[in-house]
């Protein structure tokens, strides 16, 4: 047997073994293409911060209007307005800040783009506005679905909200407050205050000026009042009233329809008292202090 003839069986065995090796696996399939955007679906663009600065003299008028978000206003000693807005919107519903001069006064509005008349899912835009403003001014602040908060101001402040709370602190002059489905809280006011809320409580602390406030379906808590001789009128429907008069004096009348009634004022002279009414003279100023509720208790100290 020659050398070459000896290698022939080995070659045949190797060929058989190679034939038994499985073929290489096929390459993995390509990833699927991303789904096409759904028709009528609004894609959010994320949140962003925008800032504006505008000159405004002390004692000027300022209007601030928002639609879906809060307004927070703080007075400072600069003759300018510094606005910071936290905005969340989408490609189809943009939020734009519009500042307009009205002579020496200023109007600021967060303008919300309206969706087109088509079926689909839309992102609800939101804008939270924070402002530093001249301390002395005549301010008008209004929003929907958000809180209106104002502090450290002198002059006049009108705060309006729908589905939101109103918070006013350390203001001198005059304050008007109105909201629906939200509380009213006022603290440290050297100012008269009037207004109303529906489905919200009222909290008052350290109020020097005259008061005329009412609520529906909410309680009233008031501590350390004065009245400035202008009078105090607190009224609720379906809510209790609790008052600590503080420095407030005058002719006190408290009435309710259902609920207990208790008036214990140091130095007060009881003119008349029944189960659901009390007339007490508190020596001092000649002002009317009237507390009224339906379906709620009244406590006066």
PLM-predicted stretches and their roles:
Residues 1-301:
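Intrinsically disordered, low-complexity terminal regions
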């Amino acid at each position: 047997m020659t050398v070459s003839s000896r290698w022939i069986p080995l070659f045949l065995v190797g060929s058989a073994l190679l034939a038994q090796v499985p073929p290489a696996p096929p390459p993995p399939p390509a990833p699927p293409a991303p789904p096409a955007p759904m028709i009528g679906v609004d894609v959010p663009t994320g949140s962003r911060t925008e800032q504006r600065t505008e000159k405004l003299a002390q004692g000027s008028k300022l209007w601030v209007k928002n639609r879906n978000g809060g307004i927070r206003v703080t007075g400072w000693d600069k003759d300018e307005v510094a606005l910071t807005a936290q905005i969340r919107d989408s490609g189809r519903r943009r939020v734009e800040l519009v500042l307009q001069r009205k002579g020496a006064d200023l109007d600021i509005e967060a303008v919300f783009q309206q969706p087109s008349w088509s079926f689909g899912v839309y992102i609800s835009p939101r804008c939270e506005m924070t402002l530093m403003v001249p301390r002395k001014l005549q301010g008008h602040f209004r929003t929907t679905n958000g809180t209106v908060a104002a502090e450290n101001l002198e002059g006049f402040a009108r705060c309006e909200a729908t589905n939101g709370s109103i918070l006013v602190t350390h203001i001198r002059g005059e304050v008007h407050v109105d909201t629906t489905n939200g509380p009213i809280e006022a603290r440290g006011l050297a100012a008269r205050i009037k207004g109303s809320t529906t489905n919200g409580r009222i909290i008052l602390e350290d109020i020097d000026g005259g008061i005329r406030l009412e609520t529906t379906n909410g309680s009233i808590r008031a501590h350390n009042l004065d009245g400035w001789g202008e009078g105090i009128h607190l009224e609720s429907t379906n809510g209790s009233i609790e008052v600590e008069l503080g420095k407030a004096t005058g002719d006190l009348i408290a009435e309710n329809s259902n609920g207990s009634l208790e008036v214990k004022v140091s130095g007060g002279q009881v003119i008349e008292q029944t189960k659901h009414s009390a007339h007490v003279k508190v020596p001092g100023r000649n002002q009317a202090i009237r507390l009224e509720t339906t379906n709620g208790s009244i406590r006066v100290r």
